[in-house]
């Protein structure tokens, strides 16, 4: 039994697999061309699916992909999509056990589970969000900002809770399952499906390395144009190691650091520390890191949830970082940022950005 999950159910299993060290997500090549799924046995499907996905019903149907109209299931408990678009290799990932075995042995047959690759899932998400916009449930800008969050998660080192992505706890320090370049390459090879333009835009604005939902928020607050709520900062690196200059090594306590955001040519770094650090050990580690940055001539700006929890706090933090960047960019850049932070339209967009990207529960990132 070959099962190709679609849309939100595909995303749910993708997140579950990323969180489970006993599971792998492996590019499936041309499985969507060679395996050709048939309508599944619903009883067997309930048995082999994870518990959080096995309660599908006519009121909450399971989303599945089929690749011909004739192969679609007629069951009201399944939302069967005939995916007739032209898809490249690796448009899907297979969920395997860490030893390489397929999902489940049902005795008389093997159950193989496939999920949409991050690129295809991004297109599906765009379609779903567009329907919400058409129903008046979301504004177009809110839909765009929500769309931007997924490629940053897939290309980053965190994953949201599959059962409750808005309120559930994230898991951190994971391997990414995509890069923006791979997502864009897949989207460029797809044809015959809606949602490609906005999916391509979202992938083009994303970058690898985000370590938490709050870092994703800050990344876009830094990089987006002012009419979208950002401060149009110069390009930066995310979570890439800094190797200290040899002459500075006698003065630092860490041989290497990995700032969340780093502008190498501007001698500026920004770090998101999760919840407020209240323990003595965490406070001392914060101080050591700041001293190391200062010893090497880098202005570092640590942030916690209180710096992003509302528009006033976020504006204040962005102004501080912009002030440091202006030493290289010039006073005109800082004036432009201050105008954007005071402008009603830009502030409104930043408020929408916060509403779609700020997690309801602060991320509890691991200590250094």
Label each residue range with its predicted role:
Residues 172-368:
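Surface segments flanking catalytic/ligand-binding clefts of nucleic-acid enzymes
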Residues 1-194, 332-333, 341-368:
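Short gly/ser-rich loop at a beta-strand->alpha-helix junction or flexible surface loop bordering the NTP-binding
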């Amino acid at each position: 039994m070959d099962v190709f999950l679609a849309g939100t159910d595909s995303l749910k299993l993708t997140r579950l697999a990323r969180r489970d060290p006993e599971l792998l997500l492996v590019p499936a090549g041309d499985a969507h061309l060679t395996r050709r799924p048939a309508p599944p046995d619903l009883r067997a499907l309930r048995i082999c699916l994870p518990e959080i996905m096995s309660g599908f019903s006519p009121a909450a149907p399971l989303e599945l992909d089929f690749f011909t109209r004739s192969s679609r299931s007629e069951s009201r408990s399944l939302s069967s999509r005939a995916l007739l678009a032209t898809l490249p290799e690796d448009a899907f990932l297979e969920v395997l056990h860490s030893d390489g075995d397929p999902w489940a042995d049902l005795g008389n047959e093997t159950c193989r589970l496939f999920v949409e690759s991050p690129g295809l899932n991004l297109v599906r998400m765009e379609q779903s969000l567009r329907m919400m916009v058409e129903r008046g449930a979301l504004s177009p800008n809110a839909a765009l900002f929500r769309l931007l969050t997924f490629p940053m998660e897939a290309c980053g080192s965190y994953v949201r809770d599959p059962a409750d992505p808005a309120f559930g706890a994230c898991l951190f320090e994971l391997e990414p399952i995509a890069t923006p370049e791979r997502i864009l390459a897949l989207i460029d090879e797809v044809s015959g499906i809606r949602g490609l333009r906005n999916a391509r835009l979202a992938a083009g604005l994303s970058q690898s390395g985000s370590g938490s939902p709050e870092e994703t928020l800050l990344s876009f607050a830094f990089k987006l144009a002012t009419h979208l709520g950002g401060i149009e900062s110069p390009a930066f690196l995310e979570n890439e190691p800094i190797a200290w200059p040899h002459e500075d090594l006698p003065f630092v306590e860490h041989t290497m650091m990995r700032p969340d955001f780093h502008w190498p040519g501007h001698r500026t770094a920004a770090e998101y520390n999760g919840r407020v650090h209240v323990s003595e050990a965490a406070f001392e580690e914060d101080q050591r890191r700041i001293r190391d940055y200062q010893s090497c001539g880098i202005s570092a700006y640590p942030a916690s949830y209180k710096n992003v929890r509302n528009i006033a706090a976020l504006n204040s933090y962005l102004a501080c970082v912009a002030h440091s960047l202006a030493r290289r960019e010039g006073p005109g850049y800082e004036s432009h940022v201050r105008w954007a932070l005071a402008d009603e339209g830009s502030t409104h967009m930043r408020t929408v950005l916060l509403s779609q990207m700020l997690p309801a529960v602060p991320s509890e990132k691991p200590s250094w």
